[in-house]
Amino acid sequence: MTNGNAEVVIVAYKPKPGKESDLLQLTREHLPVLRAEGLATDMPETTLIADGGIIVEVFEWAPGGTERAHQNPAVLALWKRYFEVCDMVKLCDLAEAKQMFASFRRLEF
């Protein structure tokens, strides 16, 4: 069964030099903040790591969550911290994504 109003997103974060541990901490915090604010569903999260320490996060926005996140002070503060420690990269630019069967390592928190 699918939820036609929810949206699954895949985002890739490339850590800035020396900021790998900060990025890991932010990734631990990210989905709990979104859920606490009612912006993400309880779909089990998937967090992966690609070559170069790039973190790939898969989660599901609640209906309207994307739009509401852009007005939410807690989320905006979290995103500000993200931009200090990483660059977001396109999934298609990851070496793994160029393969027929993209393989990543699972990151457990």
Role assignments for model-derived ranges:
Residues M1-N3, F109:
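Basic/polar N-terminal segments that are highly enriched at the extreme N-terminus
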Residues P32-P44, F59-Q99:
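An amphipathic, aromatic/His-enriched active-site/gating alpha helix that lines ligand/cofactor pockets
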Residues E96-F109:
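Short, low-order "capping/linker" segments at domain edges
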Residues T46-G52:
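A short beta-turn/loop motif at secondary-structure boundaries
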Residues K14-L26:
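Short, surface-exposed ligand-recognition loops at beta-strand->loop->(often short) alpha-helix junctions
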Residues T27, L31:
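Short amphipathic alpha-helical/adjacent loop interface patches that line ligand
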Residues K16-G18, A50, A62-G64:
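Short coil/turn motifs at secondary-structure junctions
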Residues A6-K14, V56-V58:
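Active-site-flanking beta-strand signature of metal-NTP-handling nucleotidyl enzymes
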